[in-house]
């Protein structure tokens, strides 16, 4: 277990309302690299957070990546960023039953956030789109409308579903719980919230749950890369466009920056956060093999978008 101490790494996000930040890391055993880019975009405040983390659990090296898009302020997204993955890796079944551990960690984090805030930040909530790498397994979980897309065999494949109130099953769940969905510029829970699942949202908690949908993918030679992003990207860039834009960009940090800048240039009105994880073709043993993974964090590098006039 001694070697695990040398591989623990986490992004140290600077929450900045001033301009874009980016960074990334590389596993020394050549299994994967990752990059992130985040910008307030045209907004004057920043409610997006991200997390990139390498950790050791029961002798296994795991990668944890997430994008958290806040609403009603930044507090809920910040809390989820700080606590979700810690709760997950402490779960006693994290390795033996990862899917159950993820579901429990999501709900534990939601419950603890609501308790910690008491009656404060009653409108604060957050989406989450997360990817967990354990050996040759990739588990993607989400609540809300931050999306995960993979490139497998050259094709863009969504591996998460946006949780919107007008989806028939989501609307039925909300109505069965005593809530309602109505049109107010877009379909909203209680005429207020445009996502049907989220962390926080105390006043709507009976209807807006933090139960994640989880999808598992095998990490093999056909899996090229993963994109996690807030809706600041997906509102203006399709899954296929996003994959096509960065397919030839080997550096995932540069790929994340490319997506962020494209969304800004297309007029995205929201904060924009992207995480890209690129897998290499030799996947024998997955990322948790006995070779030591030492991420090389490039750090957070300010990189203002040309012509940025954040408002």
Curated annotation (Swiss-Prot):
Record's keyword annotation contains Metal-binding: yes
Listed GO biological process terms: defense response to bacterium; protein dephosphorylation
Co-factor binding details: Binds 2 magnesium or manganese ions per subunit.
Swiss-Prot/TrEMBL catalytic activity: O-phospho-L-seryl-[protein] + H2O = L-seryl-[protein] + phosphate; O-phospho-L-threonyl-[protein] + H2O = L-threonyl-[protein] + phosphate
Cofactor field: Mg(2+); Mn(2+)
Domain of life: Eukaryota
All residue ranges annotated as the PPM-type phosphatase domain in the record: 33-279
Cellular-component GO terms for this entry: plasma membrane
UniProt note on regulation of activity: Inhibited by sodium fluoride (NaF).
Compositional bias annotation for Low complexity: 1-14
InterPro entries according to UniProt: PP2C, PP2C_BS, PPM-type-like_dom_sf, PPM-type_phosphatase-like_dom
Region (Disordered): 1-26
Keyword annotations of the record: Hydrolase, Magnesium, Manganese, Metal-binding, Plant defense, Protein phosphatase
Record-linked CDD domains: PP2Cc
One Pfam family of this chain: PP2C
Annotated Mn(2+) 2 binding sites: 69, 231, 270
PANTHER family: PROTEIN PHOSPHATASE
Family per similarity comment: Belongs to the PP2C family.
Described function: Protein phosphatase that modulates defense response to pathogenic bacteria, conferring resistance and promoting salicylic acid (SA) accumulation.
Subunit structure: Interacts with the Pseudomonas syringae pv. maculicola effector HopW1-1 (via C-terminus).
Protein name, per record: Probable protein phosphatase 2C 59
Native source organism of the sequence: Arabidopsis thaliana
Name of the gene encoding the protein in the UniProt record: WIN2
């Amino acid at each position: 277990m001694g070697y695990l101490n040398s591989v623990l790494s986490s992004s140290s996000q600077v929450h900045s309302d001033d301009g874009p930040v980016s960074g990334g890391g590389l596993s020394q055993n050549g299994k994967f690299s990752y990059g992130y880019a985040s910008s307030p975009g045209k907004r004057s405040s920043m409610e997006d957070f991200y997390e990139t983390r390498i950790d050791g659990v029961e002798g296994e090296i795991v990668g944890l990546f997430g994008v958290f898009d806040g609403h009603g302020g930044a507090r809920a997204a910040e809390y989820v960023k700080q606590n979700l993955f810690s709760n997950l890796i402490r779960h006693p079944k994290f390795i033996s039953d990862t899917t159950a551990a993820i579901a429990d960690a999501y709900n534990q984090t939601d419950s603890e956030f609501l308790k910690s805030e008491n009656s404060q930040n009653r409108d604060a909530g957050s989406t989450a789109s997360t990817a967990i790498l354990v050996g040759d397994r990739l588990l993607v979980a989400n609540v809300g409308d931050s999306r995960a897309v993979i490139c497998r065999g050259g094709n863009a494949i969504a591996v998460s579903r946006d949780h919107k109130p007008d989806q028939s099953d989501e609307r039925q769940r909300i109505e069965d719980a005593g809530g309602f969905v109505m049109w107010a510029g877009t379909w909203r829970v209680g005429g207020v919230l445009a996502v049907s699942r989220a962390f926080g949202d105390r006043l709507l908690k009976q209807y807006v749950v933090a139960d994640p949908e989880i999808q598992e993918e095998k990490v093999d030679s056909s899996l090229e890369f993963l994109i996690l992003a807030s809706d600041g990207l997906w509102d203006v860039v399709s899954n296929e466009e996003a994959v096509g834009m960065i397919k030839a960009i080997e550096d995932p940090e540069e790929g994340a920056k490319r997506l962020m800048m494209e969304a800004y240039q297309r007029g995205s009105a929201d904060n924009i956060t992207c995480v890209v994880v690129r897998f290499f073709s030799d996947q024998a043993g997955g990322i948790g093999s006995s070779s030591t993974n030492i991420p090389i964090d490039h750090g957070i590098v300010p990189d203002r978008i040309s012509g940025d006039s954040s408002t």
